[in-house]
Structure formats: structure tokens, C-alpha cells
Amino acid sequence: MSSRPANNQGPPNLPARDKSLVQRFMAVAKSLQFAWFTGHSVVLISSILYLLKMSEFYYRSAYLGVIESFGIIIYQQFFTRNEPLQTQDAAATKASIKSRVAGLLKSEDVLYLVLANFWLFTPRFSFSLIPFFAFAVFHVLIYVEKVLLPKVFHLSSKDSSKILSFIDKFVVQYNDLCMHWVGTAELLIFILVLFRAILCFQRSWIILVVYAIFIKLRYENSKYMKAAFAQWRVRMDGIISHPSIPPFVKRAYNAIKMSLIRLSEYRLSGAPQVTKKQN
């Protein structure tokens, strides 16, 4: 899943048993990882409130939460782990800058951060919140399980805590499946964006171009998006092959399919890194 907290950026060690609940919470709240968790919590709560009230305030608040959480994880990944540039010689500095830029261009977190900023400053499109809501659900649950409950409430044994056991089983069972759903949802969002452009909604063509680039980059770097495309292709092939489908529709479909296959051969994010696990 995208936007995971860095392992070395967690909150302080477990407070002493004699400290109050407030003191233990404040110790955890001082960490950068807690700010990351807060961002995802804002996304989760704002999305639910937006679904209930359809208020623009909650829509924009959700994307501010996305920007906070993804911005923090990008900061952790690219700006806190490397040797400071000012301590390197010229050649090492140049190589370090190139490495950071290449990493930023291929980062899924950067991609989602850019997209969130785009959705924030364009007309509301409610379906666009679905992937970010899904991310927020699992990130909030993981943080509650790994940090809040054990470090603040001293619930650390899955055998004795039904809450921890439930969260752990839920995340293990549905995390990977949810990422497949996100890939499918993003393709559905693209179809909706395409129809909005055809119907000439406000800024719809700009949104279509930007989201098409997003889908292309996601396809290049995400196994879940590739799986979603493959699933859609199999289903569409079955529908189009039906004898009742007119020949001109079949020809048009095959032409579009072949064009997409050729397009997939061109990478916007550079050569794939085979040694890294895809997200």
C-alpha cells in the first residue's frame, strides 16, 4: 500500500507504567509519524462526513489530510535518510541529487501527492476520494494497532486483546484485496472523467489529460493496476466477442485495444526497477 510510515520514524519507546494516559499520549504525539497518522485520520473522518453532508468543506479537508500524510512520508523517504548534500563533494552531490530526483519521479507517494493537489484545486469530483479513503482506513488501523494501543493503552498481546487481534486479522485479510479494489476504482474514475470531458464539464479536458497521465504512471509501476487492466480486458473481450455485437463495434474495440497495448510499451517513468517490490 502507498504512503507507509518509515520504520525508523516511529514514536518514542514505551513510556513507564507509572505515567498517566495523557503523558503517554503526549509522548507519542510528539513524533512525525503521529502527524502522518493525523493526516490519514482527517481523510477518513472528512470523507465520511462528506458522504453524509456533501459539504465542500469536508471534501477540501479530506484532500488537505491527504497532502499532509503523503507529504510527510515523502519527506521521510527522500529528505531525512540521505547524507546532507553540503557534506559531499561535487560529484557525490550531483549523483545524490540525480538519485533523489529519479526516486521522486518513480515514487507512488509523489504521484498521489501531486494528484491530491490537483483534486484540491479543481471542481469537486466525489468519486476521486475513494482511493484515498481506502488508504486511510488501513493506515489508521495499522497505526492504532502498532502504536496507539500498545504504547498509550498498553495493549500489546494479540492473544489477550480482542481489539488488536481483530485489527490484525482484518488488515491481513483485506489489505491486498483492497489494493486490487483501488486499481479497479481508479479505472472506473477514469471512465467517469472521460464522460465528463465528452459532456464538457468545467475544466474536464484538463482533468482528463492529467488523470490519463496518472493512470499511465500507475500502470507502469503498480502490479494492482496491471491486474485491473488485465481483468477488464478479459471481461471486455468476452462481451465484444458475442455474436450480437455489430462488426464495426468489434473493429473499433480491437483498434482501441491494440493502441493501448502499443502505448503501454512506452514508459513515462523510465526503466522499471526489477529489484524493488511493486506497490
UniProtKB/Swiss-Prot annotation:
The chain crosses the membrane at residues 32-52, 57-79, 125-145, 181-201, 204-221. This is Pore membrane protein of 33 kDa. Contributes to proper distribution and/or efficient assembly of nuclear pores. Required for normal pore density in the daughter nucleus during telophase. It is a multi-pass membrane protein. InterPro entries: PER33/POM33_regulator, TMEM33/Pom33. Its main location: endoplasmic reticulum. It is found in: Endoplasmic reticulum membrane; Nucleus, Nuclear pore complex. The lineage of its organism: Eukaryota, Fungi, Dikarya, Ascomycota, Saccharomycotina. Residues 1-31, 80-124, 202-203 are lumenal. Residues 53-56, 146-180, 222-279 are cytoplasmic. Interacts with RTN1.
